[in-house]
Curated annotation (Swiss-Prot):
Name by which UniProt lists this protein: Probable sucrose-phosphate synthase 1
BP GO terms, sorted: sucrose biosynthetic process
Catalytic activity, as annotated: beta-D-fructose 6-phosphate + UDP-alpha-D-glucose = sucrose 6(F)-phosphate + UDP + H(+)
Higher taxonomy: Eukaryota, Viridiplantae, Streptophyta, Embryophyta, Tracheophyta
Gene name in the database record: SPS1
Superkingdom assignment: Eukaryota
Species, as recorded: Citrus unshiu
Amino acid sequence: MAGNDWINSYLEAILDVGPGLDDAKSSLLLRERGRFSPTRYFVEEVITGFDETDLHRSWVKAQATRSPQERNTRLENMCWRIWNLARQKKQLEGEAAQRMAKRRLERERGRREATADMSEDLSEGEKGDIVSDVSAHGDSTRSRLPRISSVDAMETWISQQKGKKLYIVLISIHGLIRGENMELGRDSDTGGQVKYVVELARALGSMPGVYRVDLLTRQVSAPDVDWSYGEPTEMLTPRNSDDFMDDMGESSGAYIIRIPFGPKDKYIAKELLWPHIPEFVDGALNHIIRMSNVLGEQIGGGKPVWPVAIHGHYADAGDSAALLSGALNVPMLFTGHSLGRDKLEQLLKQARLSRDEINATYKIMRRIEAEELSLDASEIVITSTRQEIEEQWRLYDGFDPVLERKLRARIKRNVSCYGKFMPRMAIIPPGMEFHHIVPQDGDMDGETEGNEDNPASPDPPIWSEIMRFFTNPRKPVILALARPDPKKNITTLVKAFGECRPLRELANLTLIMGNRDGIDEMSSTSASVLLSVLKLIDKYDLYGQVAYPKHHKQSDVPEIYRLAAKTKGVFINPAFIEPFGLTLIEAAAHGLPIVATKNGGPVDIHRVLDNGLLVDPHDQQSIADALLKLVAGKQLWARCRQNGLKNIHLFSWPEHCKTYLSRIAGCKPRHPQWQRTDDGGETSESDSPGDSLRDIQDISLNLKFSLDGEKSGASGNDDSLDSEGNVADRKSRLENAVLAWSKGVLKDTRKSGSTDKVDQNTGAAKFPALRRRKHIFVISVDCDSTTGLLDATKKICEAVEKERTEGSIGFILSTSMTISEIHSFLVSGHLSPSDFDAFICNSGSDLYYSTLNSEDGPFVVDFYYHSHIEYRWGGEGLRKTLVRWASQVTDKKAESGEKVLTPAEQLSTNYCYAFSVQKPGMTPPVKELRKVLRIQALRCHVIYCQNGSRVNVIPVLASRSQALRYLYLRWGVELSKMVVFVGESGDTDYEGLLGGVHKTVILKGICSSSSNQIHANRSYPLSDVMPIDSPNIVQTPEDCTTSDIRSSLEQLGLLKV
């Protein structure tokens, strides 16, 4: 295309075009006035909205040649590429709009159905009192809870906490975490979150009423990181060690506990940690149980002191905290820090990667599912700002602000929520350590070039490093501290400064844009931002008025703030959107007024501190006017400074921790139920039948239920309206039904003659035997038929016949079948219940033990397990929703009245609602059902099993893998002594059986067809969570034999060769 030099001119003009035109009809006006410019049109209509730094980089490459013809060809190609990008962007925007519309319709439909279930008329209560009631989304820094506003208030609060001795567990598993000399910025995983969790742990450990805080993270012993990250334990020294030392005990204080998991000699990115989460959970569970027993000896009168809460930070730790919360039955808290759905939306808008590429790079779908599970399991979700709730959390299926408001109104009026739950959103801004901050006092007009009155205290070196840029260093400093990222909007700040002459005459501009050596060594994005800044400095001739030092240390940052305050300057954060804005709090603590973006967290900070002005980050003139107003107005500057210093204590760590502990105090206490009674069998090593019978009686006679609804009796609702008499009657009926059924099974078993095979070595003391086994073999093979399961079971038993006869190996059968189906299965295979120590039934919602001591039957149900997993169980409300969903699926997809799936009453139990699937191909994927239930605030674990022929819905924190952790907690059966046998695929809970500290044997050739059915439409690929090259996992050869299984066990070091 001849004459393409004109493209060069308008591409050059891109650098001067703002982020968008205020007048959408500007091009039409130009045409009407007869001054239409194709250059202007191209820039306005096609390029506007793209990142100008990227376009500039492409332009530089395109015009970097002396040959006019070659340059024209390059520019022509670039022109068409930009045009194509514009079309792709429009397409992506359309797809995004469709996604949002679909999500909105799904949410509105779910909200209508959820509201219809709650028949009582609470229209006034559901609307809420905006003035007097707590916000529907959580509490801001000025909520109804009393704040620390004076020393007296703090002392009063401290006196109220004196008698408490709380144990709190925090989890943050990625990055490099240590208490001192944190390597912030070393990589993308070691950033602000690391600093936040360390300071939170340290501050909580110093609070009255808190005995111990454990921050659990990953132990890293890689050669390319410091040795300190491999230390198992590190104590966090309190900053104010003299305040609460009187109450310190032997194991009290705050500690970093490093749990070994994942590759032992590698430091890996957080995206690669997902397959190793179960291993971390097992290691963390071991530590918490051990520490709870230690604290019990010190402060609990011999009874374990369980954590009052487990707090996960970021999605990976949230997933871990949910599993630990379920395993221990203690409350969970969650802080997202950065949310996956928001990141996914941003990446899709950038149009640089497809959805599949995004997931491959960031494992984003696994991360989103972990965040959804965190919403399911959390009592409280802690956020920094209201923006995080209103614009980020509302993207999730598991959180709906409108439905949350309705549920809260019902709870306040003590009306049943029909099994629906929504976590409490609490806005608690991060705290800050003020021990190193000394705000400037007195007259601020002193010299800045040195401290002549006190030569013993020279100015910090960073001051001279900044001052050398200025021709007049006495002018007030406008300070911006941000990395060179397009989102931080630094170029607009420089333009605002450069085009406002009064501002240039009154002030200097200091840009602290990270650390750099050479521009060529920076990332492409950072280099582009820096080059744009340098070009603007040259364009506006700002030499001598703008400082941009290359290096600074973390310890220099307070001195930089002090310099700006000393010169009566202003701190500015002009980011397009700021999730929180910790630098604004730091600036206020040093006596600096602020100018900040009106998008995001700064709004909440400004509401509390009232120490500056908010601006539209897209409005260059607004930024310049706000800066000029503060720099020129001495009274306004002084008032903003005073307000900031007066209110900054609201962002201190003691204030944060006080609100934090108040939130925890509002959680309903939960901990292992059997700890409330004298359970002699739990830790006893006795082999006597009496010990066994005491355990059996303890299980049989202590029924722990929270009953809601006519079928389940287990909603977990705080607002249950059942009377004590009804609860007792229902317990009695349930116990009698279980015992009567078990007697019938015993009679049938005796008639069939299947009791001939009795383990003579275990004798009567079945439960102690479970704990004395050298190894426990867990058969979790999900076959398409009972014949396949029976064949696999017999092969496994025959492979270790000698060890089984000696009593060193015990067996657990873990399936999706009911106990009745298991009994029929055992009879058909001529097996005895006594061949197994325990039975995990209904995908992990029921736990039975075999026994020969009781005349009531061969199976004993563990009712304590029910109380352990009943958290947030939806009961009858959940069942009705599932029945309605099944009917809708049939109406939508079935032809000629055929049923797709139907409720299976005979397969359902109090904690498992089962559905028989007649048309597996027409059944929606498991992720769709999970979504439907989450939108309606129903928290449960949906499992497609038996190759898609059955759907089991069980409590949200129940599973077959969690049942194994319960056995460890309840009976002390070491997880490392367990061997789990699985097929090549299995039910949709298959992935949970693979990871962990237990050993896994994959039986090749078994369940190989299941993956084509129920794993085809997963939210994320199974490969994202499969531990690769784990020493704990072995595979047998295809069509494994008994000898193959034994060889695999020898390979794991479990059997002697």
